[in-house]
């Protein structure tokens, strides 16, 4: 039984510490929407998405009112569309992107993910058409999010895809230059992409998933920070225990909301993603947890160790609370979406090199990082390759969301608005790797991949 003090503590988490459900994401399979006629594909996709997700926002709002738990976003993830486009060509891909955007608007969700492809071992014709369409699709739509999986720990790294994505990111930035290159904020490059991730912009509905499913992403950096702050003299082992207990409570709440949403919609419940997802709001920062643990500023020596402690404790606490843990499940460090990280970059405490080191021990990777507008496509590709390699070698998901902002230089600020926040432009090493990137081919999988 819950004690009165635990109930009061949970209410305080919601009212004072920014605890919320970050997203309820409905996964929808589009595999039965394939057809030889692009018009027929778009029609099938539109009808299926609007039919299955038509009540998602309504049900989410109902649960929010009944339980008093804020649910920030309701979203949709679909099958990677490269699997259904067949011979549609680039124009067909763009028509499908507009169809997804229209369907998302009609059901009232703010993002729909799955304009995606998996090319870790090579390209089909459809993969190439979809990747070529990305800059225009992301510029022409408001709600569509895209992702490209360029590597796995079993297959190695497709460097041809990495090189291509460097150029795609540059073109996407140019096409949305009047909106601070916002198109790049909706594009993720993955290694070991999960099939059940509820968070945008990298969500898609994997081929091993059911026809329709509800996945939930929780939040709560502010709750964890306050838990740490209540123990100013505790050793690190005691702090890890306190973080585990806090993560347990957060995860239980997420599972409650996920199961109730799935029940009311008549679809299966999938997973709870344990990720601590920050926002630009004061007191809702992963960087501030690191600082509460005793690191003077996020990025200072000790940051990577503190982040590893946090990430591990969150996973252990969450795994005790639910048998349905999935997605990314760790601590997110998106620079523009975390008030503490924004301050650390502006103060010179946190740079790209340290950020890359941090990604080796936490969830996702180099995320929402704004770069100078004159950063070359080859340098962007090399940054992607470095980050993707961390994921491949360590058998974990890593991802890259880089935003080269046209006309901006290192140290200047860029505003994205909303949950995407604002950030200083980060300085990039002025030495290049163009020859390495243009060699192409595939970087073989590590020997640790041979584990059967």
Swiss-Prot record:
Domain of life: Bacteria
InterPro entries: UPF0210
Family per similarity comment: Belongs to the UPF0210 family.
Subunit note: Homodimer.
Name of the protein described by the UniProt record: UPF0210 protein Daud_1353
Species this chain originates from: Desulforudis audaxviator (strain MP104C)
